Regions:
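Conserved catalytic segment of ABC-fold P-loop ATPases
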Residues: 155-158, 171-173
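Active-site/ligand-binding-proximal alpha/beta "capping" segment
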Residues: 153, 167-168
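Flexible, glycine/small-residue-enriched loop-and-beta-strand segment within the central core
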Residues: 72-82, 87-153, 179-189
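Short-chain dehydrogenase/reductase
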Residues: 141, 159, 175-177
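Terminal amphipathic alpha-helical/low-complexity segments used for targeting or macromolecular assembly
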Residues: 1-63, 181-184
Length: 189
């Protein structure tokens, strides 16, 4: 199975059964992600080397204004899609198998978790994985230690308060805070 076939399967939202070919490919990609993130996190890397490693991890050319403060962790890497001038602060964890799409000029605070996989709810199906992408618009600011759950879309220019758990879509231009995150006002108020 190629990386492209894996990404296509995951981006369709099809379940992944434990032990299946797609599950084995997921494990293979996770091992590569562990190897590359250990290089990112294991020592100081000048910005150009950090960019090269991140491009290798996600398989995408990065904008020269991309910023990352390690450590950074991801379970796959190949289904992260970054816009221009994205900044990811230290300690972030991306579970990207289901797809993480981040728009231009987005800021992601320390220790943010973005998850894209769920498990079956019935005990006999818990080993199965259900991918669901996360879409983060342009100009979004995600505060430190936030958790973004599978299937969420955050609209352009939204602000997510520190420590929030985002379980549902957040409209553009809104500020959302809390657990679960709730819209409290417009950024223009």
């Amino acid at each position: 199975m190629t990386n492209e076939e894996f990404i296509d399967h995951m981006n369709c939202g099809l379940p992944v059964q434990c032990g299946s070919e797609i599950h084995l490919k997921m494990h293979e990609l996770s091992q590569e992600a562990l190897r590359i993130t250990s290089q990112i996190n294991g020592k100081y890397n000048p910005p150009d080397e950090l960019g090269r490693l991140m491009q290798q991890l996600i398989g995408q050319k990065l904008d020269e204004k991309f910023g990352l403060f390690p450590p950074f962790y991801t379970d796959c890497g190949k289904n992260i899609h970054l816009g221009k001038a994205v900044f990811i602060n230290a300690g972030c964890k991306f579970q990207d198998q289901g797809g993480i799409f981040i728009g231009d000029n987005t800021l992601i605070g320390h220790n943010t978790v973005i998850a894209t996989l769920n498990h079956g709810m019935l005990p006999d199906e818990r080993g199965n994985l259900i991918p669901s992408p996360v879409h983060i618009g342009k100009g979004v600011w995600i505060g430190s230690s936030s958790v973004i759950l599978p299937g969420v879309t955050i609209g352009d220019n939204a602000v997510i308060g520190a420590g929030s758990v985002v379980t549902k879509d957040i409209p553009a231009d809104m500020i959302a805070v809390g657990n679960p995150a709730r819209v409290i006002k417009s950024i223009y108020d």
